[in-house]
C-alpha cells in the first residue's frame, strides 16, 4: 500500500504531516499533533491517550534521515485533542475538522487558496 505524505501549515499551530493511504485514510504524525497541542513528551503522551488500535508506527523522512515515528488515525487525533489542556486545542480541532479533513476527503489533499 502506497501512502502519500502531505504537509500542512497553519500560522497558529505550525506544521502537521499526514500520510493519506490509497483509500483516502489520513494518518497524522503523532509528534506533530502532540507538539501543537502542548504535550511535553510526545511518545509517552500518545501511548497514554491514544488506544493501540488508533496508532501505528511508520517510517518518516525528517529532512536528514528516515525515522520510525508514531502515526495516529482520525480517532487517535480526537483523543489527543480531547485530552489536551490547552485552550487552543478547541481551535486546532475546528481547523482540522472544518478545513483540513474536508479538503482531504474532497480533493485527496489539503488545499488552500494559496495553492
Feature map (PLM): residue ranges:
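An anion-engaging/catalytic patch
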Residues: 1-115
Amino acid at each position: 500500500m502506497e501512502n502519500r505524505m502531505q504537509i500542512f501549515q497553519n500560522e497558529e499551530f505550525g506544521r502537521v504531516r499526514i500520510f493519506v493511504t490509497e483509500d483516502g485514510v489520513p494518518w497524522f504524525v503523532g509528534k506533530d499533533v502532540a507538539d501543537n497541542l502542548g504535550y511535553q513528551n510526545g511518545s509517552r503522551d500518545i501511548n497514554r491517550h491514544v488506544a493501540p488500535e488508533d496508532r501505528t508506527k511508520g517510517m518518516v523522512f525528517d529532512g536528514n534521515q528516515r525515522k520510525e515515528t508514531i502515526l495516529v488515525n482520525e480517532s487517535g487525533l480526537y483523543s489527543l485533542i480531547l485530552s489536551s489542556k490547552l485552550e487552543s486545542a478547541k481551535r486546532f480541532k475546528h481547523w482540522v475538522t472544518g478545513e483540513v479533513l474536508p479538503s482531504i476527503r474532497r480533493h485527496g489533499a489539503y488545499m488552500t487558496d494559496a495553492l
